[in-house]
Amino acid sequence: MNASFKAYRRRIMDFRGQVGIVTGGTRGIGNAIAAKLAQRGVNLVVAARTREAAHEVAASLSNHGVKVLGMKLDVSNAEEVEKVFEETRKEFGRIDILVNNAGITKDGLLMRMREDAWDAVMDINLKGVFLCSREAVKDMTKQRYGRIINITSVAAFMGNPGQANYSASKAGIVGFTKTVAREYAVRGITVNAVAPGFIETAMTDVLPANIKDDMKKMIPLGRFGTVDDVAQAVVFLASPDAGYITGQVIHVNGGMYM
């Protein structure tokens, strides 16, 4: 790796001094995203439904030489969202990056799906993206700069039996992403989405080997992705050199969906 390439890599991947918020940032993909951003010099707010978990992750990331705050946040609650963003403004004075990662599943076949299961998934997965993005653009518009990255899913494009609520919520994120990208491009704000496929998590770890093998047969690259695979895509979209990319969905699925 020559010196000029090393310098280029440092330039696009060093966001020192920027401020980011990652929702659902204490586990899995969200935790990996928060870690990658902290490694690049981003001061962070890690938001999660459990205050203790948020504080624990924040403490672990502070050793990267950045300031990281852990905050309790139910993304479906407008008052809590406003409070977290206001505390972020008071602490850091700006918001450059928002990663809307918080999400839940409440699976069930359509005929058996309860209305409260539908509503809960929509409230967290889709309404939460709306509420957080609405707050973020207030700061980003004034700065004439911002990066919003929404975590959707391969299920938004392929569907998945038993996940009508989840798939619909993630498909809604795609439409939301494209619309907000058009609205705020003139303000220097880019809005993109990342759509993970099958990713190695605690959930997939407990699957029987034969089920994993069947799932891998659907993936041309022949393996599950890692949380770092997803985090790297998010970090790129958050970087200054991704400034001409907006309204796009980056698929991280090993070729499962093309």
Feature locations, PLM:
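C-terminal substrate-recognition "lid" of short-chain dehydrogenase/reductases
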Residues: 14, 92, 145, 223-252, ...
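Conserved glycine-rich cofactor-binding loop
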Residues: 19, 26-28, 50
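The beta1-alpha1 cofactor-binding region of Rossmann-like NAD(H)/NADP(H)-dependent oxidoreductases
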Residues: 51, 72-83, 115, 228-229
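Substrate-binding pocket helix/loop in short-chain dehydrogenase/reductase
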Residues: 81, 109-110, 114-122, 215
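Active-site helix of classical SDR
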Residues: 133, 169, 177
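Alpha-helical segment proximal to the catalytic Tyr-Lys
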Residues: 138, 182-186, 243
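Residue(s) in the substrate-gating loop at a strand-loop-helix junction
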Residues: 153
